[in-house]
Each structure stands twice: as C-alpha cells, then as structure tokens.
C-alpha cells in the first residue's frame, strides 16, 4: 500500500460487544468484519492486525455512532494515539432498503463507509469540565422529574380517596401542604399518604440543595460571564443558562444561527416532490435536552405585556454590559410580540412556543458570538 492510504474502521458498539469492519476507498465493500468483547484494548489489537496488512504508514481512523457509551471509548482510543470520530446518527447516510435488515455487521460496514465518504456530521467532544457539569445538571433534572412524578401520585391518591383541596387554586403552596399533612385516613391509607409526603419532602430538599450547587457552578470563571449574559433573556435563569452552555460547548462551531437551531432540531421539516411542497413539524434531530430547555423557556413569553420587565429580570440584567442588555431587550420584545401575533392569527399555543424556541436559539447563538449589532 502507498503512504497515502487511509483505513476507515467502522465500529458498531454495545455494552457487551463491538463489531468492527475496515474500509479503504477503491474497495467494493468493507472487509475484516469481526465481533469482539467490549474492550478498547481489543480494538487496538484489531488495528495492529490491519497495520500488518496495510502498513505502518497508512492512516487509521475509527468511528462509532453516538449512543450509550458516551465519550469513554473515544477518550480511550485517543489516549492511545488512534484517531477516532463519534458520528451523529441522525446525519448518517442511509442506503435504500438497508434499514429493514439491521445487524451489527451491516451497521459496522455502514459506519466505515460513512467515515470514508464523509456522509455524516461529527459529534462535538466537550471539555472534561463541560461534561462533568452537563452530567450534574442532567442528574438534577432526573431528580426533579421524580419530584414531579411524586406530586402527581399524591394528587391521584388523594382524588381516589375523596380528598380534594379547595382553599386555593394552586397546589404545593404552604396552605396546600398544611392541609395535606392534616388529613386523617383509615388504616394503611394514612401510612401510604405519610410515606408519599415523606418522599416529597426528601426530593424537595434534594432539588433545593442541588440548585444551590448549580448556582455555585455557574459562578465559575469559565461560565460566569456567559451565564450572566444569557440570563438577560426572559425565561432563562442560571441553571438553564449553565445547562445550555455546558451542553453546547463551543458556539463558534456554528457558522450561522440557523445551523445552531438545526443542531437542536428546532427547524421545520419539509416534504417536497415535483411542484408540491409541504412543511412538516420540527425535525427533533440533535440535542433533545437543550431543545426541551428552550421550549420551556419560551413559555415565559406568554406571560406579561410586550416591553414589560419583571423585577426578577431587571435583577438578572443588572451589572451586564449595556450592549448585552440592549440585545436581550430587543430579543425579548420581538419574541413576546411574535407570540401574541401568532395567537392572534389562530396558531395553536404549542406551535407558537416551538417557533419562539427556534428564534430564541438564534438569539442565544448571537449573544454567545457577540453579534450585538
């Protein structure tokens, strides 16, 4: 083989096993398909066997789809000086008819070909600090989801046993909690309610403690300025701002705002054929966590008048540079006005919120890249 040979190694990775295949441009199909136990050392041995075939001077590039293994395998291979790429699954080329027959060997061959023909987008590899912060925030969100589920279970239990709170319109206020603790039921029912309330108290305390920790993380030098800037936008508090920054990492890797919103799966799909063109719902391709955060943030634009600033927003904006505040005010006014205009034109609230989330993503990209003009 000549010195310019590049060997592409597709890896279909799972918890228990890796299936590997190699491909060189000019060959008809990937070769040397092999299934091995899930161990990066065995991947290195596989590559060493290929070196005896293609030579030491050839370039070797491994790749696998983003999935349950995260970045662990990538870091192992890179530490052993082996080039590795993580492929975004939603961007990979699909061969017609192949999707109906899915095996590990086929997937490994497909990945090898995608690497060779560059028919994919690589996954951004976060810094170690970003990855730790991201995992911490996701852990907190999991516990918040447990808290929400526990609240729903308590309300369902109360309703099944004729306990209906009518003192105020809202649940989980001080009045509601006092009422909940004062209920007297027969036998095991009382024990069930007590256990539910005990679990609720534990989860509430845990979430509050984690929120304080996230607040402290957002004050780190690497994040403080960016978090301060993002919190000038309506609906984005420090935990949300920190989560977006840690999840995305380098905003400069997106050349345009539209690329960033597409990365989050917030752009509408399209079905075009001949003269016909049909707009579809959002693609939902990309980072689901940030997409959910921005859709939740967009809901805040449905509360308050155009141009109105709450006391909390004014406090968050205080101390930021004038150009940042002016940019945020422009975004806030435009998004709030757009929301009410869409409702006036008969659009459903959820459609309007999703449209706002897409545009909010564009404003976030502009702020992180200092596009204040």
Task: List the model feature ranges, each with a label.
Residues 2-24, 111:
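Gly/Thr-rich phosphate-binding beta-strand-loop-beta motif of the actin/hexokinase/Hsp70
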Residues 15-42:
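Short glycine-rich, Thr/Ser-proximal phosphate-binding strand/loop in the N-terminal lobe
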Residues 40-60:
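Short, basic/hydrophobic alpha-helical segments
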Residues 85-124, 131, 135, 276-285:
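Short alpha-helix plus adjacent loop in nuclease-associated cores
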Residues 141-229:
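Glycine-rich, often acidic, oxyanion-interacting loops/wings at catalytic, nucleic-acid
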Residues 228-232, 238, 243-345:
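Phosphate-backbone recognition surface of nucleic-acid-processing proteins
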Residues 337-373:
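Basic, amphipathic alpha-helical segments enriched in Lys/Arg and hydrophobic/aromatic residues
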């Amino acid at each position: 083989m000549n010195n310019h040979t590049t060997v592409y190694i597709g890896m279909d990775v799972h918890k228990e096993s890796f299936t590997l295949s190699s491909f060189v441009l000019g060959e008809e199909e990937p070769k040397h398909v092999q299934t091995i136990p899930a161990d990066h050392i065995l991947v290195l041995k596989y590559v060493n066997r290929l070196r005896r075939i293609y030579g030491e001077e050839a370039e070797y590039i491994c790749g696998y789809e983003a999935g349950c293994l995260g970045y662990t395998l990538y870091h192992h291979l890179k530490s052993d000086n082996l080039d590795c790429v993580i492929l975004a699954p939603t961007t990979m080329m699909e061969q017609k008819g192949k999707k109906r027959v899915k095996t590990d060997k086929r997937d490994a061959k497909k990945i090898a070909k995608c690497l060779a023909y560059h028919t994919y987008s690589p996954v951004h590899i976060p810094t170690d600090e970003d990855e730790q912060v991201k995992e911490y925030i996701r852990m907190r969100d999991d516990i918040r989801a447990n808290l929400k589920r526990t609240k729903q279970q308590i309300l369902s239990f109360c309703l099944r046993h004729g306990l209906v709170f009518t003192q105020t319109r809202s649940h989980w206020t001080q009045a509601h909690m006092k009422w909940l603790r004062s209920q007297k039921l027969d036998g095991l029912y009382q024990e069930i309610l007590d256990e539910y309330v005990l679990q609720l108290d534990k989860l509430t305390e845990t979430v509050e403690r984690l929120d304080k920790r996230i607040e402290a993380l957002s004050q780190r030098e690497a994040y403080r300025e960016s978090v301060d800037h993002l919190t000038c936008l309506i609906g984005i508090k420090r935990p949300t701002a920190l989560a977006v920054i840690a999840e995305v990492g380098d905003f400069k890797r997106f050349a345009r705002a539209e690329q960033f919103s597409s990365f989050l799966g917030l752009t509408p799909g399209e079905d075009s054929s001949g003269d016909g063109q049909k707009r579809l719902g959002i693609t939902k391709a990309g980072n689901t966590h940030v997409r959910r955060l921005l859709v939740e943030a967009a809901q805040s634009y449905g509360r308050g008048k155009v141009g109105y600033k709450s006391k909390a927003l004014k406090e968050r904006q205080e101390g930021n540079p004038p150009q940042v505040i002016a940019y945020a005010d422009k975004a806030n006014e435009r998004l709030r006005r757009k929301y009410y205009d869409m409702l006036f034109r008969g659009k459903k609230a959820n459609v309007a919120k999703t449209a706002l989330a897409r545009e909010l993503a564009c404003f976030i990209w502009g702020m992180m890249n200092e596009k204040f003009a």
